[in-house]
Swiss-Prot record:
Has 3 domains, the large (RuvB-L) and small ATPase (RuvB-S) domains and the C-terminal head (RuvB-H) domain. The head domain binds DNA, while the ATPase domains jointly bind ATP, ADP or are empty depending on the state of the subunit in the translocation cycle. During a single DNA translocation step the structure of each domain remains the same, but their relative positions change. GO terms for biological process: DNA recombination; DNA repair. Homohexamer. Forms an RuvA(8)-RuvB(12)-Holliday junction (HJ) complex. HJ DNA is sandwiched between 2 RuvA tetramers; dsDNA enters through RuvA and exits via RuvB. An RuvB hexamer assembles on each DNA strand where it exits the tetramer. Each RuvB hexamer is contacted by two RuvA subunits (via domain III) on 2 adjacent RuvB subunits; this complex drives branch migration. In the full resolvosome a probable DNA-RuvA(4)-RuvB(12)-RuvC(2) complex forms which resolves the HJ. One of its GO terms (molecular function) is ATP hydrolysis activity. DNA binds at R290, R309, R314. The lineage of its organism: Bacteria, Pseudomonadati, Pseudomonadota, Alphaproteobacteria, Caulobacterales. This is Holliday junction branch migration complex subunit RuvB. Keywords: ATP-binding, Cytoplasm, DNA damage, DNA recombination, DNA repair, DNA-binding, Hydrolase, Nucleotide-binding. Belongs to the RuvB family. One of its GO terms (cellular component) is cytoplasm. ATP binds at L19, R20, G61, K64, T65, T66, R170, Y180, R217. NCBIfam families: PRK00080.1, ruvB.
Length: 344
């Protein structure tokens, strides 16, 4: 499901490598994480050692891949990248590990999707810098141990809770990335616009930031489309009015909800009296797959307090009624507390 407000990377989407920050000082947001990583990098570099293994986790689109690349650049070492789904066999990972040079950074995206047999050979590699392989089959099979160069594994996941405990415990530096504030996103947007040559002013940046769901990837995607509308309309500057008009044409409202989000909320409120309603029922009501409802639509609505999960099903909160301009039942409480969605 391709949505302009999705934090997930989309097929054929431009990578915007030229827009990415190159150093920690250029990286906007995540101040505590940056401060801690800077200390760890300086310490490892001063000792001439590999940085401890790093686990980057949190919602999609917050810059985990960019941060991994910056770590390698700040350490002055090579950067190798792969992903959990690509490493189908133990030999795939072994080929990468044996070609790493001392202190290199290996980045594995979506590490929660790593196959169990591949994960098993990662344990000794991370802990003891050795690779235990079985050569041959049957009675003639033998175990071979290969020494590896000390390296740093930087792994990224949106589902840290799916990692096996032995794997999670081997990361000496866990880093949770948080949603961005509107001010931080506005800074990201102004920097990106300058590099793109887009005539974005601060009021336009704040308007886009308010609808970007706290996610730089979404902000960048919205900026590209707003730039297109501004060029088509002959706008000399992208101010708040121009940005709002373009975003309205994209059907992204003032808090970042799109048509699919609103259709979900209306189905829950108008078809099922605000709930409780089961996820399967809601999926049928809006003609979407259950996985899409749970993984794509609901996370932001839960995080923002529009809906809540209960043992009996989904329920609309007062904020959902207010946003849609509907009268909430008198006995309905306020918004649900933000759900911790991304490490379950």
């Amino acid at each position: 499901m391709s949505r302009i407000v999705s934090g997930e990377a989309q097929p054929f989407e431009p990578a915007d490598r030229a827009l990415r920050p190159q150093t920690l000082s250029e990286f906007v947001g995540q101040e505590q994480a940056k401060a801690n990583l800077s200390v760890f990098i300086d310490a490892a570099r001063g000792r001439g050692e590999a940085l401890d293994h790093v686990l980057l986790f949190g919602p999609p689109g917050l810059g985990k891949t960019t941060l991994a690349q910056i770590l390698a650049r700040e350490l002055g070492v090579n950067f190798r990248a792969t992903s959990g789904p690509v490493l189908a066999k133990a030999g795939d990972l072994a080929a990468i590990l044996t070609n790493l040079e001392p202190r290199d950074v290996l980045f594995i995206d979506e590490i929660h999707r790593l196959a169990a047999n591949v994960e098993e050979i990662l344990y000794p590699a991370m802990e003891d810098h050795v690779l235990d392989l079985v050569i041959g089959e049957g009675p003639s099979a033998r175990s071979v141990r290969i020494d590896l160069a000390p390296f740093t594994l930087v792994a990224a996941t949106t589902r840290a809770g799916l990692l096996a405990t032995p794997l999670r415990d081997r990361f000496g530096i866990p880093v949770r990335l948080e949603f961005y504030t509107h001010d931080e996103l506005a800074r990201v947007l102004l920097g990106a616009a300058a590099k793109m040559g887009a005539p974005l002013d601060p009021s336009g940046a704040r308007e886009i930031a308010a609808r970007a769901r706290g996610t730089p990837r979404v902000a960048g995607r919205l900026l590209r489309r707003v730039r297109d509308f501004a060029a088509a309309d002959g706008a000399e500057v992208i101010d708040r009015k121009a940005a709002a008009a373009a975003l309205a044409r994209l059907d992204v409202d003032e808090v970042g909800l799109d048509a699919l989000d609103r259709r979900y909320l209306r189905a829950l409120i108008e078809n099922y009296a605000g709930g409780p309603a089961g996820v399967e029922t809601l999926a049928y009501a809006i003609a979407e797959a259950r996985d899409a409802v749970e993984d794509v639509i609901e996370p932001f609505l839960l995080q923002q307090g529009f809906i809540q999960r209960t043992p009996r099903g989904r329920m609309a909160c007062a904020k959902a009624y207010e946003h849609l301009g509907l009268q909430a039942p008198r006995n309905l409480g306020g918004a649900a507390p933000p759900a911790d969605l991304f490490d379950k």
